[in-house]
Amino acid sequence: MSKRESGVLMHISSLPGQYGIGTFGKSAFDFVDFLVRTKQTYWQILPLGTTSYGDSPYQSFSAFAGNTNFIDFDILIEEGLLTIEDVATNWGEDETTVDYALLYEKRRPILEKAVAAFLAKGKTPAYEKFVADKAEWLEPFAEYMAIKESFDMKPWTAWSDEAIKRRQPDALAQYRERLADKLEYHRVTQFLFDEQWHALKKYANDNFIQIIGDMPIYVAADSVEMWATPHYFKTDSEGNPLCVAGCPADDFSPLGQLWGNPIYNWEAMKEDGYTWWSKRLQASFELFDVVRIDHFRGFSAYWEIPASAENATIGKWVKGPGYDLFKAVKEQLGELPIIAEDLGFMDEDVINLREATGFPGMKILEFGFMGEDPKSGDLPHHYPVNAVAYTGTHDNDTVLGWYKSATEETREFCNRYLNRCDEEPISFALLRGLYGSVSRMTVATMQDLLQLDETARMNIPSTLGGNWVWRMTKEQLTESVEEFLLGITELYDRANPQHNVDVK
């Protein structure tokens, strides 16, 4: 029988701490300890990439670089790169949310001090090795960010210098010379990110916790990939996207979803054996133990929308690379532990692709109660073994928020299905139903374990502002939360056998 396992979805940004956002510091190590005490196997996070306008981790300036907001200042103080006085500033009054505008203003000058101190000590062998090993993506990223900053953070298509827009060698050499200090800043901060992340990951792995990372299928239009490798995308002669990604209209979104990400030129990628994808996945597995690939159905067929469209209604389905891509990646990298995010519109081709790869798909418990239909494949009694079951994802409301907004008929069906008594919190009842399913792996969102309502929702798709800001406080992670999670983990045979400890 396959081993049954469980974990918790909690993004780094949502960890408690004194610097306005969760980091790779003490709170992250404490969270690993919480997972150990509750006998979990996995810690799932959202993408670790650099965030841009809108603060979404799914819209990054790079498919490879890390988000320097997660660099922990206390660790830099311990390393002698900062002083307590350097970080003594107002990081905001509300510890339950992230103020990205404040972070943008406050963190850069502090990180510049740390970089100066790092360089003053002399470049370490570890740093030199990192720069050499990661040069293929690190140098274009450092160039892109330094030049972008010199143009007031405008996307590369809006840069006033045509020569550097097209990355002409002479122009690039001039900018590299003029912005040498800025390039070094981005190299060093990526190194500090990498060092701190791998120290945290080692601690997790040493304590038998595996990290599930998240890889967006697409890159952003405002990204180093679009600037440095435009031949991998469907673009016009100026490098602008000819078409963009999204989702067709459905009952929840009558105009569809217009994401705006450029569409890949799959023919060009196929011609070089999908090496860009192999390198991207290899980089992901250097960071994570398991990788969830977002919008898996886009590899079978994707919704292509003209770049000039105002919404997603006039798009069309276009065939993706299919199994060819995963066959090529497997030949280059071997078997990979991947979770296929197969939510949304599914057809036979997507299902066949997922089954051909052998990747587990996803099940979302909230979806099962919509329509009050016992035949719904999203109810636990219909879950397959080879699936990862969630109460919800970052795009869903918390289960308490969902329950509050559901119809009376849906709530009644939900309560009857779960055999819930009035005294049992709905969040706990739904988690109990989830953990009792036959799916080999279940993942609880942290907000649901804390019984939080819609105010703790991570993201509302197709909206701007107020997303990606939720943070947990230290006080919220109580002994009763631990006792509940440990209880259902043991009751439904999901306890990590490596963790024989009592809740403290």
Residue ranges of predicted features:
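N-terminal regions that are enriched for targeting/export leaders
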Residues: 1-13, 29
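Alpha-amylase-like alpha-glycosidases and glucanotransferases acting on alpha-linked glucans and related
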Residues: 2, 11, 55-190, 219-443, ...
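Short alpha-helical segments and helix-capping/turn motifs at coil-helix boundaries
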Residues: 26-33, 195-203, 277-279, 426-430
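Catalytic domains of carbohydrate-active enzymes, especially glycoside hydrolases
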Residues: 26-51, 287-288
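Surface-exposed amphipathic alpha-helices with a cationic face
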Residues: 36, 197-205, 330, 354-355
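Structured C-terminal cap/extension of enzyme domains
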Residues: 451-503
